[in-house]
């Protein structure tokens, strides 16, 4: 590898397609009221791809080559296909990443090394942008095959859910990934709001084994924030569950904020370790993706 040179019923009640989420929720809250404000409410959207070079599991991950292109470029190219984003930037504290991104045409915002996670990096980048935005989409740079429809889905879910400050997406978890701590699991309530996220298996049954018949949910890295809340988030102190699980979204839940979750039909292909690169490349060859 080289771096860059240029089915329970309760579950079913909230499972909605990301693209149709807007219509379904709008009907629930009153289509007339929703349509009357849709052009103004959370309408300006920016996608931010936070990227850092240092990583305990995979140093230099954003720049790793995937079939001839750096991973950060592949994520950026997929993100540009989303119809809800008015602008896309890469936020990084590393000049190597910045130089690479500028080389393929991406806008770059330099951020400080003190950012503790991608969400804080997004907030710092947002403050440095000249234009004002209502929604910020945190697009994980290690999802080179992210579907643009998923980006659109989480944006629309946040736009039509006024009491939520955060939205994200989940997909079905493969039984063999049930005990993998790199595969974050999620449980939701009957209205589609997040209850909890964990690196462990949730829910966890008395047998201590993965139930192949239970619809476990896998969290996808894509996250959408109300821009005003993003500033609040950065000022909140780290919380016990967030620190124990090392999952930044838990700070949102621990402080009592609501998070909307949509379920999508998507096979997750994140890059967590060097071994994942070969898997991604094999899949892309199978799909004739260049």
Curated annotation (Swiss-Prot):
Keywords: Cell wall biogenesis/degradation, Magnesium, Membrane, Mitochondrion, Mitochondrion outer membrane, Nucleotidyltransferase, Transferase, Transit peptide
EC number: 2.7.7.38
pH effect summary: Optimum pH is 9.5.
GO molecular function ontology, one term from the record: 3-deoxy-manno-octulosonate cytidylyltransferase activity
InterPro entries: Cytidylyl_trans (IPR003329), KdsB (IPR004528), Nucleotide-diphossugar_trans (IPR029044)
Cofactor(s) the protein needs: Mg(2+)
Topology of the protein relative to the lipid bilayer: Peripheral membrane protein
PANTHER family recorded: 3-DEOXY-MANNO-OCTULOSONATE CYTIDYLYLTRANSFERASE, 3-DEOXY-MANNO-OCTULOSONATE CYTIDYLYLTRANSFERASE, MITOCHONDRIAL
Function (record text): Catalyzes the production of the sugar nucleotide CMP-3-deoxy-D-manno-octulosonate (CMP-KDO). CTP is the preferred nucleotide donor, but it can partially be replaced with UTP. Activates KDO during the biosynthesis of rhamnogalacturonan II (RG-II), a structurally complex pectic polysaccharide of the primary cell wall. RG-II is essential for the cell wall integrity of rapidly growing tissues and pollen tube growth and elongation.
Entry's family note: Belongs to the KdsB family.
Note: Rhamnogalacturonan II (RG-II) RG-II is a structurally complex pectic polysaccharide present in the primary cell wall. RG-II consists of a linear 1,4-linked a-Dgalacturonic acid backbone with four distinct side chains, two of which contain apiosyl residues. Boric acid forms a diester with two apiosyl residues from separate RG-II molecules, thereby covalently cross-linking two RG-II molecules as a dimer.
Name the UniProt record assigns to this protein: 3-deoxy-manno-octulosonate cytidylyltransferase, mitochondrial
Taxonomic classification: Eukaryota, Viridiplantae, Streptophyta, Embryophyta, Tracheophyta
